[in-house]
């Protein structure tokens, strides 16, 4: 009897908000294959709204930073042990770990050893550093679902089963869009020249980057006094932190601080100065010229450089996807006012059509309807003998 014809149990774990969003789309798509499937594991509100039963509060897994993780370690280990035992006692037809690889791979390994099919949705950055983790991933999973094409190439090289499903952000953002609506929402006119500053979402990023970003904005506004500068800040705490640095650095700078609204700020901008991470992908999908400037604490940087080998030429996603430097990147001491100003000036004074065409081509390459692709791959794994 085909497994499509019986009620399935699908174990699924998301560790943070981004995973909950991916999980919501995946559950919706899996229901088309298995309308009566039971979903249970660790879910946020979006997955729960799709009918997923959560055995633990997802917030318990959303821990950032070494010190914070150590403080919560006994509880995390207890959850992991109980979760593994639950799924061994009540075997699902498949277990899907969404991102959170440090937690999920350690759940997947004992389940796979017990004969349960396992999937890791979102690859760890194993292609960039700590490459030996590929052996851990291979031992823990039957299938990896990769969001980016170069990730699949890496897994293929190591003969680890992997399906490239595309990126949900590329599905959510239109290939072409009208920026006038975003400008109107932010009180900007169609003729304004606009620079967006995105100094990160974490306190450490805002603390390390804001002064350099603000001083760069001062230089650019001196070149063009009509330049409008917008800064979306993720919450009230980050806004207060940025305001304090702004008042100490350039209290007379003409600048608009926004509550969230990062999507509108990106869409409205002629150019963006931003920290690394998913925001660089989002900026590319909005077809915006950008400069990436990033710093971490000198001691942390030294530890990373000393202990780990990095296998990448670039650290921003647009450049990794293009395998060339489409976006200027400045790290640590190179992330300075002179470099950032020099890189941004031409972006604010030309139409950047060739760059935007490259961004559009990459957008098309990763816009595959990721949730449907992921569900198809999971269904194929479930139905395989």
From Swiss-Prot:
Keywords: Glycosyltransferase, Lipid A biosynthesis, Lipid biosynthesis, Lipid metabolism, Transferase. It comes from the Bacteria. It catalyses: a lipid X + a UDP-2-N,3-O-bis[(3R)-3-hydroxyacyl]-alpha-D-glucosamine = a lipid A disaccharide + UDP + H(+). One of its GO terms (molecular function) is phospholipid binding. This is Lipid-A-disaccharide synthase. Condensation of UDP-2,3-diacylglucosamine and 2,3-diacylglucosamine-1-phosphate to form lipid A disaccharide, a precursor of lipid A, a phosphorylated glycolipid that anchors the lipopolysaccharide to the outer membrane of the cell. GO terms for cellular component: membrane. Belongs to the LpxB family. Its EC number is 2.4.1.182. One of its GO terms (biological process) is lipid A biosynthetic process. The keyword Cytoplasm does not apply. Pathway: Bacterial outer membrane biogenesis; LPS lipid A biosynthesis. InterPro entries: Glyco_trans_19.
